[in-house]
Amino acid sequence: MRKMNPRLALGIALVALGTIMRVLPHPWNLTPVGAVSLFSGACFDRKRWAFAVPFATMFVSDTLLEIFTGHGYHSLMPVIYATFALIVVLGMIVRGKRDSALVVGSGAVASATIFYVVSNFAVWTASTMYPRTLAGLIACYVAAIPFYGTMLLGDVVYSALLFGTFVWAERRLPQFAEAK
């Protein structure tokens, strides 16, 4: 019987963690999905896994939320998924410096900021909650500040946990060492 690749096992575990954390009750946006997206881009050798892990996390959790609450699927899903794809690309940019707390912390702040800017611009353009004026756009961003705060907290904390644990494992466990 063939052993499972440790990085593949990690990907599956991340999908499970992200799904569980999104489905369980939590403060808005305080989930590991942004951190998982950043981490996936930085730590998975294959691009398909880097994108598949956060997309699978979102799709499985969105489906469960739709089944159990009726609020999993919505019209802005393509924008949300595209935003997480941008965060995966950001992770690919920080890949070579994933053992730097400053780089990972900056990446986490950038990922929350990217999500805040893109998703709220999409809300402003696609909904009737705000007038299509500069004042309406500003009102949309101001109303979303609390969500940005919890996303920022989640991205920073979960990124520290994910990257810290992974860098430790790469240094201590040969099966996690990056192939040279």
Predicted regions, residues:
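Central hydrophobic cores of alpha-helical transmembrane segments
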Residues: A50-V60, V104-A112, A179
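Short, charged juxtamembrane terminal tails flanking transmembrane helices
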Residues: M1-M4, L173-K180
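Non-cytosolic membrane-interface motifs at loop->transmembrane helix junctions
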Residues: V33-S37, H71-V79, V104, L137-Y141
